[in-house]
Curated annotation (Swiss-Prot):
Site (Transition state stabilizer): 66
InterPro entries linked to this entry: ABM_dom, Dimeric_a/b-barrel, Heme-degrading_MO, IsdG
Name of the molecule in the record: Heme oxygenase (staphylobilin-producing)
Subcellular location: Cytoplasm
Amino acid sequence: MYVVTNRIDVKKGFAEKMAPKFTQGGKIQELEGFQKVEVWLIDDEADYDQMYINTWWDSEDDFKGWLKSDAFKEAHEGKSKTKSDDSPILGNKVVKANVISELS
């Protein structure tokens, strides 16, 4: 299993407004190896919200297929790489990991 986490820092109060956009469903669900998406709001005392958007895949290759897909392009169209003062997004970091041990 392969898990990708996009850690996104947003202005305080915006995480709960933005979270449904990541879990509304769509073409990602039809892609080979896709398992699920979860959005977490990190519980801390920061002056900003930190969201973790976690996607689970059967393999790294399946995740790479998502990155190359039309579904990925459609999900991210209109997103500017340049930050504006109006954007609630303060920054992000993507973390990729192979699950090497699990207890269910």
